Amino acid sequence: MKLTWLGHSAFRLENGSAKILIDPFFTGNPGFAGQDGKSAAEGITHILLTHGHGDHVGDTVQLARETGATVLANADLAAWLSAKGVAKVDMGNTGGTVHFDGFSVTFTNALHSSAQITEDGVSHSLGNANGLMLHFEDGPAVYHMGDTDIFSDMKLINELHQPDIGLVPIGDRFTMGGAVAALACQRFFKFQNVIPCHYGSFPIIDQTPDKFVAGMEGAEARVHTPKAGDTLSF
């Protein structure tokens, strides 16, 4: 498996024939600046969205049109994407699992909101915010937490899904901060590898992973802090 952090909460994941983008926020993402959007989206088969905020939906509509990738989102967000002209949309909701060729995606809880704001400044709800649990027929299980705070049912997510790799938001203000995120990983999960995300993108969220790294001292999980654009192999 190859996993590339594309800044903020955006990741590219390759495993077998699956080439997946999660929350592809490219345009306007300072962490993506200087990266090649065509390379990041090359050959993608699926786009997975945790929720409807603009810094997660990102370039989904354009990328779906250009690549023909299937987009998976919660039911409300999926309907919105269809109205925007996305041809191949699949949907699910919290607790549900969607099966694709070689992998499956389960929608988990996340403590956050999900909406798009129209030009008149009105916020329109687009279903629940979710985490995404990816299981592969051959490869490690990956849990993208989405945007969330800590919650005790994370213990059940670990019990049910036993994720190997955690993609963990740590930026504070809109998600849990680094120290709390480390507590979540240490108390509720048995990750082998963790990658912090949703930090350093904008001035109002934490700029470094230092608090998370410090909180993970002594953990069995290996903490990776790649630069945006770096690829890790598992």
UniProtKB/Swiss-Prot annotation:
SUPFAM superfamilies in the record:
Metallo-hydrolase/oxidoreductase
Q: Which InterPro entries match?
A: Metallo-B-lactamas (IPR001279), RibonucZ/Hydroxyglut_hydro (IPR036866), UPF0173 (IPR022877), UPF0173_UPF0282_UlaG_hydrolase (IPR050114)
Q: Does the keyword Hydrolase apply?
A: yes
Lineage, top-rank taxon, reads Bacteria
GO molecular function terms noted in the UniProt entry: hydrolase activity
Task: Write the record's keywords in alphabetical order, separated by commas.
Answer: Hydrolase
Entries under SMART domains matching the protein:
Lactamase_B
**Keyword Signal assigned:** no
| Pfam families for the chain | Lactamase_B_2 (PF12706)
User: What NCBIfam families does this protein's entry cite?
Assistant: PRK00685.1 (NF001911)
Family of this protein: Belongs to the UPF0173 family.
> Could you identify this protein by its name?
UPF0173 metal-dependent hydrolase Atu1317
